[in-house]
UniProtKB/Swiss-Prot annotation:
UniProt-annotated binding residues for substrate: 68, 72-75, 144
Binding-site residues for ATP, renumbered to this chain: 5-12, 92
CDD domains: ASKHA_NBD_PanK-III (cd24015)
GO molecular function: ATP binding; metal ion binding; pantothenate kinase activity
Name assigned to this protein: Type III pantothenate kinase
Organism superkingdom: Bacteria
Quaternary structure, from the entry: Homodimer.
Alphabetized NCBIfam families for the sequence: baf, PRK13333.1
Species whose genome carries this gene: Campylobacter jejuni (strain RM1221)
EC number: 2.7.1.33
Alphabetical UniProt keywords: ATP-binding, Coenzyme A biosynthesis, Cytoplasm, Kinase, Metal-binding, Nucleotide-binding, Potassium, Transferase
Function of the molecule: Catalyzes the phosphorylation of pantothenate (Pan), the first step in CoA biosynthesis.
Pathway: Cofactor biosynthesis; coenzyme A biosynthesis; CoA from (R)-pantothenate: step 1/5
Encoding gene, per UniProt annotation: coaX
Amino acid sequence: MLLCDIGNSNANFLDDNKYFTLSIDQFLEFKNEQKIFYINVNEHLKEHLKNQKKFINLEPYFLFDTIYQGLGIDRIAACYTIEDGVVVDAGSAITIDIISNSIHLGGFILPGIANYKKIYSHISPRLKSEFNTQVSLDAFPQKTMDALSYGVFKGIYLLIKDAAQNKKLYFTGGDGQFLANYFDHAIYDKLLIFRGMKKIIKENPNLLY
C-alpha cells in the first residue's frame, strides 16, 4: 500500500514501511502502477491530481469532530489516531492542535523554525544568523546568535507547554524530534500523519478494491 502526504515543498511517501520524500518537481514526474492514497494541502496540485487515475484522495473520508473552520487535512490526519493529547507538527509552519476525548478543541499556528530565520534576516542584515540549537533556555543570552535562538525556541516551548497542561505531547514533522527534546515524556512519531491515513483506509476497506 502506497501512501502520499503532499505539502507545499515536498511529497512524503510511505510504501509499506519504506519512507521517502520527493520535491514537488520530482513528484510531478512520479509514475506508479499501483494505487496511491494521498492527502494534499498544495493548492497548485489539485487539478493535476484530479487527472491521475491511480491517485485516491482520502480527504473526503475523514470524519473529524471539530468546529475549527478551515482545518487543513494534514492537521486532521495527524490528530486522527489521538484520543487525548497535543499534536505538534513542526514543518514550514508549526501547528499545535489540542485533542480531548477524540474531540478537537482548537489549535494555533506559528512560523516554522526556518521561517523564523527568514523573518529575522528581513528585519536587519545583522540579524541574519544560524540558530544555536544547544542554547540554554534557563539563562539570559549574552550574544546575538543565542538571543535569536532563545527568542524562537523559548517562545515555541512556552506556547506548547501552556497548551499541553498535563496532556501527552505528540510531535511530528521535520523539526519535531528537535522540539520534542525540550519536553519530558514527549513522543516523536515521524509517521503520525500516515497512521491517520491508514486508520481511514481500515475504516473504509472498499478503497482498496
